[in-house]
Amino acid sequence: MNSDILLQNRIKEARQEKKLSQEDLAKLVGTTRQTIISIEKNQFNPSARLALLICIALEKKFEELFYF
C-alpha cells in the first residue's frame, strides 16, 4: 500500500459554510490552525480520529468531506 497517496477534501468549503475560521475549527477538534491549513491544502492526511472529529464539527459525513 502506498502511504504517499493523499486524500482530497472539501473541508475548506464546509468550514466556510459554517462560518468558522481555521482557528475556530482547530479549537473544536483539538489541533492547531497549521494542521487545519495543511489538511485543507491536501498536504497532510489527518488521522482517522481527527478526520472523524472534523466531520462531527462540520456536521458532515466522511464521504462528503474526503475522497481520493
Predicted features and spans:
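Residue-level signal for the short linker/turn that defines the boundary of a DNA-recognition helix
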Residues: N9, K19-L20, P46-R49
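A short, Lys/Arg-rich alpha-helix, primarily the initiator
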Residues: M1-E17
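Short alpha-helical DNA-recognition segment
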Residues: L20-T35
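DNA major-groove recognition helix of helix-turn-helix/homeodomain DNA-binding modules
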Residues: R49-E64
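Alpha-helical residues within the helix-turn-helix
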Residues: Q16, K27, I56
